[in-house]
UniProtKB/Swiss-Prot annotation:
Highest taxon listed in the record's lineage: Bacteria
Extent of the signal sequence: 1-30
Transmembrane segments: none
Record-level Gene Ontology MF annotations: alpha-galactosidase activity; carbohydrate binding; metal ion binding
Active-site residues per Swiss-Prot or TrEMBL entry: 397 (nucleophile), 452 (proton donor/acceptor)
Catalytic reactions of this protein: Hydrolysis of terminal, non-reducing alpha-D-galactose residues in alpha-D-galactosides, including galactose oligosaccharides, galactomannans and galactolipids
Cofactor: Ca(2+)
This protein's name: Probable retaining alpha-galactosidase
Entry keyword Calcium: yes
Organism, as annotated: Streptomyces bingchenggensis (strain BCW-1)
Amino acid sequence: MARSVRRTTLALLLSAVLAMTLFVTAPAHAQDSTWTVSGPSARSGPQARLQLDATTGALTLQVSRGGRTVLEPSPLGIRTEGADLSRGLRLSGRERRVVAERYRTAVGKQRSRDVRMTETRFRFRGDGGARFDLVVRVSDDGVAYRYVLPKGSGDVLGETSAFTLPTDATAWLGAYRRDNENLFNQYPAATAPTGEYMAQALFETRGTYALIAESDLSGRYSAARLIHEAGLPTYRIGLWDERVTSDGALSTPWRALVVGDLATVTESTFTDDLAPASRVADTSWIRPGPALWTWLAGGKPAGQSLSMQKGYVDYAAQRGWPYVVVDAGWYFDPDQWDVTDPDWQTNSWIPELVTYARERGVGIQVWIHHRDLDTAEEREQWLPTLERWGVKGVKIDFMDSESQDTLRWYDEILPATAAHHLLVNFHGSTIPKGIQRTWPHVMTMEGVNGEEKRVNTAQHLTTLPFTRNVIGSMDFTPGAFHRPQRPNAASDAGELGLSVLYESGIQNLAGTPESYDARPLARGFLEQLPAAWDRTRLLAGRPGESAVLARASGGRWFIGGTFAGAAHTAEVPLRLGSGTWLVDLVLDGPDGLVREPRVVRGGDTLSVPVVADGGFAAIACHWRPGRTSCDRTAA
């Protein structure tokens, strides 16, 4: 009897295991032409619907949230030199799993991350027997897919991937440039001008937002841009290279949609969550922080003057800023700008500056042109030398390409700089498509129409937190109070708020010492500024109109707001947590900046007067009797 029970129990267990296996991997039947992939929170998060046309064998992907369409059925597919895998497809199997990860980043809007995504791998065969997998992931804040090609598939000739929006969608787009630096403008998605657009494009339909993004981009592939034809709500994926070379198995980058209400999209870490885990084992040397950036402050003369740089070091030390960034000129021929001195190692004053700065608690980072690091031999000359001198980081400029060859260069420079304990800031570059999870010493990247541009608008400033800065750290370089060309020139409080609003692991402060000393309230605020955050919350905003974000560090919240349009009183709902809080506001007054402390409840709505195209900054801390300031040194 006991033996019979054991046999019966074993048979039941075996049947259960077999049933689970069949559920996971069984080939689809002929009638299976539509499949749904839901995230962990199926009721509130996005849902992906994959459809295989029975007549053409073509694939489409549709995305919805809360029963509303976010993405209309949009074509999928990839073309290789051996096969067109966009038509004539047949499903041969499926596999499902849950992706659950926990990781920490050195910088970003939230350093501790908990990831939970559902993943379905669809296996397809095309005409002639060619094979590929489509991997679809869905989380509470996004949908992503990638193509996985087996070895022998050959080079990639393009994708048929596209994003088709609802006809009533609104778009915020930046025209494509090879350095990803351009203004964001608002259009109806269907009637935006014909052209190419940067891949970080934001769309909104009846209160739900979707941000197109890319993750896990490396030299195995080529970067994407969006190609649009006016009159159609479709944005096609175009690659930098007409042919992407591949001599083995290939996983393409993730094509991602960050989906949700505006707060969900703004606070999302989805592009990092999709990226590979950190490849830097020891991260103890990676330290974010504000930097005094000397280019807008001192221009060409500063880059070639040891005495000027020592002055900047003195000022940074007084402010408690951990870094000074020496920009272009320091290794140029003294008589020829933009020409590398062949004896730069012997002639350089950087070692003296590093010693001077170290004695004052300041680290030195240096600018380098990409052309001086584009070969292995050059990197073997430069990087060990900089490490030996004690330089803390490099700002590498003018890649100006997202080709496969350039991405392969990134694959080489990233482990090399990590090996020599050099923090990295890329300028004239691609944008951080998950790179800061995989390579945590990447503190920030440009890829933005930043402070040095003379054509920015207030609308552009209010769009960046919802587009480019969602993707990863953004070296906008705020704080240039001395520049009359900035769009918020009438609002020093608005300029100050950008230092919080725009996240960057090295927050390069672009003002002159004189401009900070003329604004002691701004100077005091920037002395308190962290560069890495425990969490981020959107308090208020809409792209092109306003943006107010709160970022937490330790027990304090830093708040920054920027607005486009006429002077008004902004109503800002606080999301600081329970209890009573002191909100230490910095506002524009009739004769300059003014400080206005207020005691509020953590869920109150804050009324803030802002000037035209202006803004504000604030620090919030738990209030107790007698507390009048949120400064670190305050009682």
